[in-house]
Structures are given as structure tokens and as C-alpha cells.
Design a protein with these regions (language model features):
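Conserved beta-strand -> loop -> alpha-helix junction used to position metal-binding or nucleic-acid-contacting
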Residues: 123-124
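Segments forming glycine/polar-rich beta-alpha architectures that bind adenosine-containing cofactors
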Residues: 69-72, 78-83
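Contiguous alpha-helical scaffold segments within structured protein domains
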Residues: 287-291
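Long, low-complexity, intrinsically disordered segments
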Residues: 362-369
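A conserved beta-strand-loop-helix scaffold within acyl/acetyltransferase catalytic domains
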Residues: 6-70, 98-119, 128-284, 295-306, ...
């Protein structure tokens, strides 16, 4: 694809351009990592920024004064140049650009003079063939799996969405039950629930269902990571009555199956709002804000981090990089993209209403995992 100058592509334009879609998919197939393929990406970052020369793309979202790059797909050696294109594009529009990336690329940007503030962690089982429940480090995981297995007839099996309407309805009902226990959910959950209910799961996704005595306890969606010969644990749904160890049982069975298939790695996904200790490269104002929100349990996902750590993954920190002169107040826009990625709150405020719209910021909605 020939694109000499950097280019912003809106979601609607992307949906009407098959050539651009093919170009993006080719980049994901060759270079894409977890945030590029995650189900939440289509909601959190529905637009596209194409770098100069079309060497790479960022999946992006924006607010009136802010650009947020959720994921990059392209060659590693082109990342710094693509990031520079995005920072330059944003500056011309008097916008503040923010780029979410793992530590190696964030350190690269810090070396170029940008700040890189801790925002979370990526957790991976890098060598699936060597994964085992044996050893003292796996004692807690073994205990929880064993606790679940004490219930009779526990099994995890892959299900092809659409192959049985009754099962599709049961899975959709499980998603509804899971939603009922959450204060807030991202819009991508409802979008995905609709696809499950209609039996239209995306081709790169696989669905695994775990039953206990014939009752559905949880559903796990994994998404293919073609560039790594791996899979991402993308979405997990479970009911209130699921006993201790239900998710651990399901994940261990999925890992066992994937290893037999020759899959190389398994990612437990990104966990935002954890492991945000101060570092030399951070924007101290943003770091202080995030740690305050973490202490107040507004932006805190420590429990999810600890859950995934039972599988003894490799953990790589995630950072948000931005210009050193960027106003710290603008970082609230990044948090609001997580809380309201489709900007529905602003739409409600602009629409005529019988009662005044609230302006109280919502707590960030962390992708389910």
C-alpha cells in the first residue's frame, strides 16, 4: 500500500476500504501482538494511524485534545519513526499524543526524550511446551484446580459458536450473569455477546466452555496471535456459583490442548492498573495521579495480576509515553477512553435531555480478564 504521508483513518473509512483492511491484517499477521488482536481493541482504539511510508500502523482513539495509541503493528525497527510521525501529527493539531507500549519500546521512546509512565503489565507463558503444574511454585495453582476437580464431571471442551442454538443461548446468558456482577463494562462486551448469541464468532477466535455436572461454569475466548504462533486469553466469563478453581481448571486444560497442537506461547493478556511503581523515565505528575487512583482502588487491578501470576508467566511492564511538556491534566482523557471508549457520555451531554447530564468522571473500565 502506497501512503507517503502519515494518515489518520476513521473507523467508517476503514470499514469501506477493503485494500486498507487487507493491509492492516497483513501487518497483524506478521507483527501483531496482544493489543492488536484483542477483542477490546475495536472499541478502545477503533481508528487507525498509518505511519509515513505505510511501514506500520497504530490503533488509535481520540478526544478533543488527546490522541491515544492503544497498539502498534509493524516492524520493530520502524516503531520509533512511526511514533515520531504520530507525535508530530498530534502536535500540528494541538493535540497531546499518548502511546501505550511494552517496556522495550517505551524505553526506546524515553531515550528519544519522551516520558514513559508505568501503566500495567503484560503477562505471558512464553514456552507452552514446557508448561507444567509440577513443582513448589505451582502448589497454589494445583490446590485450586484440585478443589474444583473434587466436584464430579468437570470438563472443558471447545465449542464452535453457532453449531447449537441452545448452547449459544446458554453462553449468552452466562455473559449476562457475569455482567450483572460488574459495576461497569466496556461496550465491546455487549458487542461480543451479540456475536456469541448469533453464532458469529470471529474466525481468529476460539471458544472454550467448562461444565460441572452438566452446568456451564465459565466461557473463555482466546484469540490467535499469528506472529507468535500463539494465542491470547481474550475474554473470560463466569457465573456467581462457580466454585473456587473453575477458571484455573479451564485455563490449564486449554494450555494442555494448545501444547498438543504445537502452539508456541500463550498470553494471559494485559493487566492495567497494577505494577505502577515510580521509575526515572516517568512523568512524575502522571505517575502520582495514577498511584493515587490505584490507592483509592479506582484504577487498581492487582487482584487480576495476582490471579494470572499463579501460572508463573513472564511479566513485562506497560508504559504510556508522551511529550515531556504535555499537560498532566490531559492524561484524564486517556483514562476516560478506557471508561467510555465510544464517548457515549459526551454524546448524552450534547443530546437534548429532560435532566442535566452528569459530568462526574467514571472509573476506568478494565478489559475483562
Amino acid at each position: 500500500m502506497e501512503t507517503r504521508a502519515p494518515r489518520w483513518v476513521e473507523r467508517d473509512e476503514l470499514n469501506r476500504d477493503p485494500a486498507m483492511q487487507d493491509f492492516v491484517q497483513s501487518l497483524i499477521a506478521r507483527f501483531g501482538r496482544e493489543l492488536s488482536v484483542a477483542v477490546a481493541r475495536s472499541s478502545l482504539a477503533p481508528h487507525l494511524f498509518v505511519s509515513r511510508g505505510a511501514h506500520g500502523v497504530f490503533f488509535v482513539n481520540r478526544r478533543p485534545n488527546t490522541v491515544f495509541a492503544f497498539a502498534y503493528a509493524g516492524p520493530d525497527e520502524r516503531f520509533a519513526g512511526a511514533a515520531g510521525d504520530l507525535f508530530e501529527y498530534a502536535a500540528r493539531g494541538k493535540l497531546v499524543a499518548n502511546i501505550l507500549e511494552e517496556e522495550p519500546k517505551a524505553k526506546e521512546l524515553a531515550g528519544l526524550g519522551y516520558t514513559s509512565t508505568p501503566f500495567g503489565v503484560m503477562q505471558r507463558v512464553p514456552r507452552l511446551a514446557g508448561f507444567s503444574l509440577e513443582g513448589t511454585k505451582m502448589r497454589r495453582l494445583r490446590y485450586q484446580i484440585g478443589h474444583y476437580e473434587k466436584h464430579e464431571r468437570c470438563e472443558t471442551r471447545e465449542y464452535r459458536a453457532g453449531s447449537d442454538p441452545a448452547t449459544d443461548r446458554t453462553v449468552a446468558a452466562l455473559v449476562d450473569a457475569w455482567k450483572a456482577g460488574k459495576k461497569q463494562i466496556g461496550p465491546y462486551v455487549d458487542h461480543f455477546r451479540g456475536r456469541i448469541a448469533s453464532g458469529e464468532l470471529p474466525g481468529d477466535c476460539r471458544l472454550f466452555l467448562t461444565y460441572r455436572n452438566g452446568e456451564l461454569d465459565n466461557a473463555i475466548v482466546i484469540s490467535r496471535l499469528p506472529a507468535a504462533n500463539g494465542y491470547l486469553m481474550d475474554l473470560e466469563f463466569y457465573g456467581a456459583e462457580m466454585p473456587l478453581g473453575g477458571l484455573e481448571f479451564a485455563i490449564s486444560r486449554i494450555l494442555e490442548l494448545l501444547a498438543k497442537e504445537g502452539v508456541s506461547c500463550f498470553s494471559l493478556g494485559a493487566t492495567f492498573g497494577t505494577q505502577m511503581e515510580a521509575c526515572a523515565e516517568e512523568d512524575p505528575r502522571v505517575g502520582k495521579m495514577l498511584r493515587g487512583l490505584h490507592t483509592a482502588r479506582i484504577f487498581n487491578n492487582d487482584g487480576n495480576f495476582q490471579f494470572k501470576n499463579k501460572f508463573r508467566p513472564e511479566n513485562t511492564r506497560l508504559f504510556v509515553s508522551r511529550s515531556r511538556d504535555a499537560p498532566s491534566a490531559s492524561f484524564t482523557d486517556v483514562l476516560m477512553i478506557f471508561a467510555d471508549p465510544e464517548n457515549r457520555r459526551q454524546s448524552r451531554q450534547e443530546a437534548p435531555a429532560s435532566a442535566p447530564a452528569t459530568t462526574t468522571p467514571a472509573a476506568p473500565v478494565l478489559p475483562p480478564s
